[in-house]
Design a protein with these regions (language model features):
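Membrane-helix boundary elements
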Residues: 49-69
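Membrane-embedded alpha-helical hairpins and interfacial helices in multi-pass inner-membrane proteins
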Residues: 24-35, 43, 63-165
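Hydrophobic transmembrane alpha-helices
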Residues: 1-49, 53-56
């Protein structure tokens, strides 16, 4: 599927905006940050399978959402990095194993975010506990909710089958 640069920017911008809105909705229920978090926006992490515009879209959306929520700089920087790593991993899996493409964002967030929680939010030394709680939240958002978002997005974008990009 050949896309113009305008369409790439529009898709990326829409994904970033949707990420911000869904993160703020999650924040209304105190689920967007902290030891136990299930960001609804993370359900969009399957989108790099459908369009490479989702990689910068998700990353910019995370950056903006963390900034708007007043997160410490470590969370803004390293939370965005975790999302970028997960999005790139998902994009790399799009052809060979799209059904498993939810794994990179779960792993990147489960490994990086506990470190952020310990240093930026001064959560007591409980790295393994944080890996489990953040990983479980990511599993719910990416693995469970994301599985349902994927076909809806696929239909909305008019993609019949994942195409090499």
């Amino acid at each position: 599927m050949k896309k113009s640069s305008t369409q790439f920017v529009v898709y990326g911008g829409l994904i970033a905006a949707l990420y911000v809105v869904l993160t703020l909705v999650s924040q209304l229920f105190c689920l967007a940050s902290g030891v136990i978090q299930v960001r609804l926006s993370e359900s969009l992490c399957m989108l790099p399978c459908l369009t490479s515009a989702a990689v910068p879209g998700l990353s910019i959306g995370c950056l903006i959402a963390n900034f708007i929520m007043g997160s410490p700089w470590q969370d803004v920087v390293f939370g965005t990095l975790a999302t970028l790593i997960g999005a790139v991993g998902t994009w790399m899996m799009r052809k060979k194993a799209p059904q498993w493409s939810w794994i990179p964002p779960v792993l990147s967030n489960a490994i990086i975010i506990p470190i952020v929680l310990i240093y930026a939010y001064h959560v007591p030394d409980a790295w393994w506990f944080l890996v489990l709680t953040v990983g479980a939240g990511e599993l719910i958002a990416c693995g469970l909710i994301g599985i349902y978002v994927y076909p809806v997005a696929q239909k909305a974008l008019g993609i019949q089958k994942v195409q090499p990009q």
